[in-house]
Amino acid sequence: MTGLNTAGADRDLATAELNRELQDKGFLLTTTEDIINWARNGSLHWMTFGLACCAVEMMQTSMPRYDLERFGTAPRASPRQSDLMIVAGTLTNKMAPALRKVYDQMPEPRYVISMGSCANGGGYYHYSYSVVRGCDRIVPVDIYVPGCPPTAEALLYGILQLQRRASGAPARW
C-alpha cells in the first residue's frame, strides 16, 4: 500500500491472517508471552518529560487533528503507570539526575523516545557547559525523532515505529 493513510495497514493484515488461521483450524496456538506483547503493543501509556519548545509540538499530537489515542496510547501523569517516556527539549546537567530517577521508577518494559535536536544531541546549546549532549547519555533511547522542533507528524511516526519495534517487526526508519 502506498499513500498517506497506511497507518492501520499492518494491523489489518495481521487481523486478516489471524481470521484465516482461526477459520482453517478453529483454534489458535500461541504463547502467553506473545499475547502479553500483543496487548502491550496496542496500549502504550506515555508520560511527557517536556523541557522546552518541543513539548508544545508534543501536546499537539493529543489534539483532535492527530489524536494520538486512536493508536492505543494514553497519557499518564505518574512514571509508575507509564511504559513510554518522551524526552523533549534541552536536558541540563542539573536536570539529568531527575530524568534518571523518573526513568528508574517506570515499570518494565519501558521505552524512551528522544524528541528534537536538543534531546538528541544538545541542539543549539550543544557547546554549553551546562547542557547534556543527548539524553542517551543518561537513559537508553529506543527511538530518535529529529527536528527543531520536530512536527507532530514526526512524533506520531516515531510512536508508530516504536509500536512496530515492540511487536517484533523491523522498524522502517
UniProtKB/Swiss-Prot annotation:
Source superkingdom: Bacteria
Catalysed reaction equations from the record: a quinone + NADH + 5 H(+)(in) = a quinol + NAD(+) + 4 H(+)(out)
Free-text comment on the cofactor: Binds 1 [4Fe-4S] cluster.
Record: residues binding [4Fe-4S] cluster: C53, C54, C118, C148
One Pfam family named in its UniProt record: Oxidored_q6
Chief localisation class: membrane
Entry keyword annotation includes Iron-sulfur: yes
Membrane topology: Peripheral membrane protein
Names of the cofactor(s): [4Fe-4S] cluster
UniProt-listed GO biological process terms: aerobic respiration; electron transport coupled proton transport
Gene Ontology molecular function, alphabetical: 4 iron, 4 sulfur cluster binding; iron ion binding; NADH dehydrogenase (ubiquinone) activity; NADH:ubiquinone reductase (non-electrogenic) activity; quinone binding
EC number: 7.1.1.-
Keyword Metal-binding set for record: yes
Subunit structure: NDH-1 is composed of at least 14 different subunits, Nqo1 to Nqo14. The complex has a L-shaped structure, with the hydrophobic arm (subunits Nqo7, Nqo8, Nqo10 to Nqo14) embedded in the inner membrane and the hydrophilic peripheral arm (subunits Nqo1 to Nqo6, Nqo9) protruding into the bacterial cytoplasm. The hydrophilic domain contains all the redox centers.
Family designation: Belongs to the complex I 20 kDa subunit family.
Protein's name according to its UniProt entry: NADH-quinone oxidoreductase subunit 6
Organism: Paracoccus denitrificans
Higher taxonomy: Bacteria, Pseudomonadati, Pseudomonadota, Alphaproteobacteria, Rhodobacterales
Gene that this polypeptide is encoded by: nqo6
